[in-house]
Structure formats: structure tokens, C-alpha cells
Amino acid sequence: MIYSENLKKGVKNLLYNCANISKNETLIIILEDPALGWYKKDIADAVKKEAEEVGIKTTILEVGGPQNDSKNKLTETINDFDCTVFFARIGDQDRFDTSSFKTKRVMSYARSAENLASKFGCTHHQSLLEFKKAINTIFAKGGNIQITCPLGTHFSGEINKSNIEENLDVGVLRFPMLVPTPISANAFSGKVVLSKYLTPTGSKVYEPASIALSEDVLAIVEKGKISHFEGDKETVKKIQNHYENISKMFEIEKYNIDSWHAGIHPGTYYEDNINDNPDRWSNTIFGSPKFLHFHTCGDYAPGEICWMVENHSIYIDEKPLWKDGVLMFNNFEETRECVSKWVDLQEIFIK
């Protein structure tokens, strides 16, 4: 493994700027079996190397893929350490749960040393936290929200401050910070174009994890509930069956849309073929400003079925905060000032 300066910067960003770990603490790194294709061992090795160099007692525990009882098996082990870093999807399964774990958890969406050494992993964590807060503030001030996309999505509703409360957010530290707090969908209506794939949210495990859509389909939504689907009959039936199966499997509300949010980190990238693993694609690229995603199927965040909307626009009282998949930070004082403050944000948004 080449321990480059950029990699060292990314490792320090994770350990100190995000996890805020100190040398008198203990660290466990949960590494998902690299053979599963989601995480590479080199990222765990790099973090362990830095931690041990400063005197942090560090353990790497390799685990399998996520299961629906993953939390129960690991809770006791994790609580024996001051800090846990997840290079594993199981760290994302209970990201909205704050009740079971007593110690600090970090869920990493950086999946390899190369990923960590890129702008995705090196952008100062605090800058992204402040940028997220700026966007939350903008939404809290907003009145009418309109969401569109080039394929024909038209989805709108009114929001108020109660929709931006932090208790809707996750109970685990995320690295890097990729999305603002989810916006409740219960006041939104319209049509959303479903294209390419329906994918899981990373919450529970089920098969098939994703379904391919041979034709685009319209989801008609009324006040946060899916009324019906319109389009090619076979594709619509496939979608309906998927929702039926997942909702029965977990005994959840089939056609509920819990919330939505869009990516805020332009350094997010995905270089593999989408068709090889749509689940991995959607659960990696969601942090890009080019994508907005919906949490559907279930009356909780993040739901179980994800809708990915590409090159969306989001208008707040007719002013675009996102336009065709580009985050228009200059249009709002809060985001403009945040980018002006942080060189790291200027490097990903401007340079």
C-alpha cells in the first residue's frame, strides 16, 4: 500500500475531524469482507496505521455482508470500544437508531484508500457539516418547494421549520457528510419519474435487492402517499409486486414516502458499471449533487425502497438551490458564505 500524503490527509480527516478520537481512546474498525466488492482492505489498513502511530489501541474485525440481525450480534463488541469505524454496510443499517449503542460510531462511505485520498475523503469534514447546516437553514426558511427533472418529475409541497428538526437525522457520524437532513414528504404531491432501477436504502436486507425498469414509470403521489403508477403495464406490475413483497416481508406501510434529500458533495463519484450492482451504485452515488433520492415503503427513514432522481432541480419559492443536478450555492446567502469561508469547499464547488 502506498501511503501518500493525500491518503494521510484523508485518514486524519476521518479520525480527527470526524471521529474526534484521541490517543487515550480505543478503536475498533469493522471491515466488510473485501471479497463482497464493497470495501477494500487497504482503507482499514491505512486508518489502523495512523491510529497506532499516535498510540490509539486499534483492532480490525472482519465481518460478512449485512443481515437483518447484524446489530444484535455486534452491539456488545462495539460498546467495549470508545470508537467504531465502519468500513462495512452494517454500519449504515441502523443509522437512524440512537438507542442501542453507547459509544461513538462512524459510518464511512469512503470504500478504498484511493477513495479516501481523493477530494471525496480529503474535503475537511467540518466544512461539509457547516455546508449541511447552511442548507438545512435555507430549507427551514423556505415556503413552496418544487422538484423537477429532465424526464418529467414535477413534485411540490410546502415546508416549515418542523420538517428540518435534527431528530429526523441519523444517530451515527457519517463520513464524509453527503446529504442534508431529510425533508418530510407528507405535504408533497405530484409525479416522480422512476427510471433505470429501484434500489434498497441500506436499511434491511432482501432479495432481489434491486429491480430493473425496462421503461420509465410515473409514480403519482398525494400528500406523501403513492396513489398509483402509470406507464408500461409490465413494468408497473413489476414495481407493484416489488412493493407488495417488501411491505409484506417487513410488515410496513407499502406506499408511504417518508422523506427525500439530495446530495451535497461534488467529490462523490462511481466508476464501475451501474448495471453490475445497482445497489452499490445508488448507495455510493447518492451524495452527489447530481442525485436526489426518496425514502419509500415504510413510515420511517430511510424506508426500504429508494427512488433515484438524476439531474434534478429544487426550487425554493421559485429560486433554484439545485439546477439540473448542480448545487447553486451562490443563489443563497447561507451557502454562499459557507463556501467563501472554506477553501476546501471552493476546491470542490469552484475549481
PLM regions: where:
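Dual-mode signal for accessory low-complexity, basic/Gly-rich regions
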Residues: A212, H228-E230, E234-H295, Q346-F349
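A broad, low-specificity signal marking well-ordered, structured residues that form hydrophobic/aromatic
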Residues: I145, G190-V192, D258-W260, L292-F294, ...
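Active-site and channel-lining beta-strand-loop segments
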Residues: E215-E230, I314
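Internal helix-turn-beta structural module
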Residues: D279-E347
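Active-site bordering "gate/hinge" segments
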Residues: M1-D216, E222, K319-D324, M328-K351
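Short conserved micro-motifs at the rims of enzyme active sites and ligand-binding pockets
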Residues: K204-V205, G231-D232, E271-I274, I305-W307, ...
